[in-house]
Design a protein with these regions (language model features):
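Intracellular loop-helix junctions on the cytosolic face of multi-pass helical membrane proteins
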Residues: 1-7, 132-140, 162-333, 355, ...
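Helix-loop boundary and gating motifs at the non-cytosolic
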Residues: 3-53, 251-264, 322-333
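Hydrophobic core of transmembrane alpha-helices in multi-pass small-molecule transporters
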Residues: 17, 86, 99-121, 398-430
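Central cavity-lining transmembrane alpha-helices of secondary-active solute carriers
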Residues: 50-68, 155, 342-359
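Glycine-rich segments within core transmembrane alpha-helices of 12-TM secondary carriers
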Residues: 56, 138-169, 186-194, 282-284, ...
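Hydrophobic alpha-helical transmembrane and interfacial-helix anchor sites in secondary transporters
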Residues: 66, 126, 164, 358, ...
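Cytoplasmic membrane-interface "Motif A"-like loop-to-helix N-cap segments
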Residues: 69-80, 137, 301-311, 361-380
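C-terminal ends and interior cores of transmembrane alpha-helices
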Residues: 79-99, 319-327, 377-406
Length: 508
């Protein structure tokens, strides 16, 4: 999994981890901040929140166009500094008046613009690391590792936001409203770490930027290693656009984690947990489980006795920690609806080595699915996740009929959502990192930035469509109908991918 990866991958992945940690720390409390600080009603706060998300995923298109003209490295650096200014403005406690609202709006625009310049272009740089022949066969596994790094940042972000806010309230005696700004300040600090890593280890990926630097300095066009004809370029762009169309519906379904799945957690899922199940709601226990997984892989792959010994020590220590936590459980723990969102990034981090190892083994025996086939399989698995939700929702009352008055005895087990997030994570691992890898591999070199930007543009459209199941929820649709629509969309998308699989495989 970790072998034969370019050194530049680790530098770019860690830089991205720092940026994503800051982004998700801000995002974890932003909606609550809008209501607590400005008193916005839920509809207005949600509109601001969703519009911001859409901007975050649409602006990489502009970032890609700019990078194709000015260079990826320059745009990544510019993006980090613009984001920093945005988070800095957001971290200032300016009050609740019109000036504060205007400042918040400006900060959101800066954060979205900076993300647009940074996010997609950094991934293009990762893709170019694998243009070298000795690394080409590890492109998919490399993007899986890069994607895992994103989720490491996301995994700890909500806890960081909550902890820093509580510390500010208890130690500094600041108000709840002002404590949100401390969470935004964490995002500023994370960007400082991110830019430090990006520059300190630039020697590991400087060859990726060498060609574009030469082109700018010498004022001579850089000849592409494999020039494409107009027909080949057109075919590749068409294939990518077909994949982008499918990606829209994946993110529409997947990002229900912050919409209908969270509503289901609030209205239909048990609010307390005890015994072994309750351990899943402590992120430190999930991290220990991740160490067990990685320790097992280290034990299997280490070629020296020292390496195997270290791996075994990690496994024993993690299991001992889990046993200690289990033996000291005291009664039931409260389960809040947002806590379920910690499972997805934890699953991604834990399952990435499993995914990489599985496909590496399939590659060795000549049975590995192609990138387009993996995308199609991802849509099928996503459909299965919502079929599972439909099965678990049988017999439950309609959303508006039940609302929030359900008693603990009539609520379903938390295991339904925990298992659903697991299924959706399998789908995500098949589609998201593989899809990004596919774009970096297939995109015509002179349109690489634009194509990566369009990937994020498709994600943005999917984010906007997330509201449709929410509208169905509010219109008193049956739960099975809501999950059925999502399952059906994923299934149709999968069938579409497999219907054009030969065309997609030809360009990949």
């Amino acid at each position: 999994m970790f072998e034969n990866q370019p050194k530049g991958l680790w530098a770019l992945a860690l830089a991205n981890t720092g940026e994503r940690f800051g982004y998700y720390t801000m995002l974890a409390v932003f909606l609550l901040y809008l209501q607590a600080n400005f008193g916005f009603e839920t509809g207005l706060a949600s509109t601001i929140y969703s519009t911001f998300l859409m901007m975050v995923y649409f602006l990489p298109i502009i970032g890609g166009i700019a990078a194709d003209k000015f260079g990826f490295g320059r745009m990544v650096t510019t993006g980090i500094f613009i984001m920093f200014i945005g988070y800095l403005v957001l971290s200032l406690p300016l009050g609740k008046d019109t000036v504060a609202i205007a400042a918040m709006g400006i900060s959101l625009i800066l954060i979205a613009l900076g993300t647009g310049l940074f996010k997609g272009n950094l991934q293009v740089m990762v893709g170019r690391l694998y243009d070298e022949p000795q690394y080409a066969s590890n492109r998919d596994s490399g993007f899986s590792l890069f994607y895992m790094a994103i989720n490491i940042g996301a995994m700890f972000a909500p806890t960081a936001a909550i902890k820093i806010m509580k510390w500010a309230q208890e130690s500094l005696s600041v108000s709840v409203e002002d404590s949100y700004h401390f969470a935004f300040a964490v995002a500023c600090a994370s960007l400082i770490i991110s830019i430090a890593i990006y520059y300190a280890f630039s020697f590991t990926y400087k060859h990726v930027l060498a060609s574009e630097t030469k082109g700018k300095d010498d004022k001579t066009p850089v000849k592409e290693t494999n020039e494409l004809s107009k027909a080949e370029t057109k075919e590749r762009i068409i294939c990518l656009c077909l994949v982008f169309a499918v990606v829209i519906f994946f993110w529409m379904a997947f990002h229900q984690n912050g919409n209908t799945l969270t509503l289901f957690a609030r209205d239909y899922t048990q609010k307390t947990s005890e015994g072994f199940q309750s351990m899943a709601f402590d992120v430190t226990n999930l991290v220990a489980c991740i160490f067990v997984v990685y320790g097992c892989f280290g034990l299997a792959q280490s070629k020296t006795g020292k390496g195997k010994g270290i791996s075994l020590g990690v496994i024993v220590a993690a299991i001992a920690f889990l046993f200690y936590k289990y033996s000291n459980l005291e009664g039931a723990v409260d389960v809040e609806a947002p806590i379920f969102q910690q499972f997805n990034p934890c699953y991604v981090v834990a399952l990435t080595p499993v995914s990489v190892a599985l496909f590496s083994w399939l590659h060795k025996i000549g049975k590995e699915p192609t990138s387009p086939e993996k995308i199609g399989l991802g849509m099928l698995v996503a459909a299965l996740g919502f079929v599972w939700m439909a099965v678990g929702s049988m017999g439950l009352e309609l959303p508006l009929t039940q609302g929030d008055p359900a008693t603990e005895g009539t609520r379903v087990s938390a295991n339904l959502l925990i298992s659903t997030y697991l299924i959706l994570t399998f789908a995500e691992l098949l589609l998201s990192p593989i899809g990004i890898s596919f774009v970096s591999k297939v995109a015509p070199p002179k349109y690489a930035g634009l194509m990566m930007g369009l990937w994020f543009g498709a994600t943005a459209i999917g984010n906007q469509l997330v509201m449709i199941p929410g509208i169905m929820w509010g219109q008193n649709f049956n739960l099975i109908a809501i999950w059925g629509v999502l399952a059906g969309i994923c299934l149709v998308s999968a069938l579409f991918i497999f219907s054009i699989i030969k065309k997609l495989n030809r360009v990949s």
